[in-house]
Amino acid sequence: MKPSSSCNLLTILGPTASGKTRLAVSLARELSGEIISADSRQVFRRMDIGTGKDLHEYGAVPYHLIDVLEPGQECSVFTFQRLFLRAFQDISARGQLPILCGGTGLYLDAALRGYRMVEVPENPRLRTELANKSDTELAAILLHLVPDQHNRTDLADRNRTIRAIEIASYQPDEQEEQEPFPAIQPLVLGIRWDRAELRRRITQRLRQRLEAGMLDEIQQLHTGGVAWERLDYYGLEYRYGGLFLRGELNRNDLFQKLNAAIHDFAKRQETWFRRMERNGVTIHWLDGAGDPVAGARKVISGYFA
């Protein structure tokens, strides 16, 4: 099958542990596709087990935006969009189909909503004004600027809250010319599971990651120079794993608290996807417990021939 003029970006989304990568790889093989990761953590090298890269699943299928930054660096939504557009245009120019795959809502929005992000520079004057504010005052300022604040980690760390205020307050120069966003015609597929089954899959996967050496991976990152505070930014596995390695959690509490936190994270992802639908993104939902590949084929038959 070849891409048609009605779709130039196939997107596969779903909550964590839903089987997105496996579906993306299967469709990439059938559609001459290349996968672009929309995962805020898989961009980092040497963060393999905790982020669930599962690179063995790709086989010969080319992938992009995995292992492109060093641990300790940041990958803002602006950075992701720039990298995504570069990969999208490269894949398209070679006559292949870009397949965006992931569950990071901000990244998916940056690719699908058709507007260019603006790189926000630091504002020394604003930072000086905010320096004497309490954490509660900073949170109130951010929530005033962005009432629909989904990224709760921005409220959990003072520096992140200040940066979020900086971004929300930024007024770009009207004279600043922006390159037009390329015409993207997406077909969006989502994988949906019964809540109880998704919880079982999440718990099973966490056990597998711990057995595969996730804690050793976290320790090696820290030994290699990544501060515990920085590791906190890289997701729940690294945050709770760091607490365990610092002696602040025992093994049982690590598993129970991390497992519960990932379940809550999956709920937030599902909330984000519903928000995307309310904002006009059509998502064709597939039953994860059935045959999502067959379901996907039925949907895409009207777009590819």
Curated annotation (Swiss-Prot):
Name of protein:
tRNA dimethylallyltransferase 2
Q: Where is this region: Interaction with substrate tRNA?
A: 39-42
The signal sequence is none
Keyword Magnesium assigned to the entry: answer is yes
Which reactions does this protein catalyse? adenosine(37) in tRNA + dimethylallyl diphosphate = N(6)-dimethylallyladenosine(37) in tRNA + diphosphate
HAMAP family, from UniProt? IPP_trans
Q: How does it assemble?
A: Monomer.
* Taxonomic lineage: Bacteria, Pseudomonadati, Thermodesulfobacteriota, Desulfuromonadia, Geobacterales
Q: What is this protein's function per UniProt?
A: Catalyzes the transfer of a dimethylallyl group onto the adenine at position 37 in tRNAs that read codons beginning with uridine, leading to the formation of N6-(dimethylallyl)adenosine (i(6)A).
Quote the Gene3D superfamilies the UniProt record gives. Answer: P-loop containing nucleotide triphosphate hydrolases (3.40.50.300)
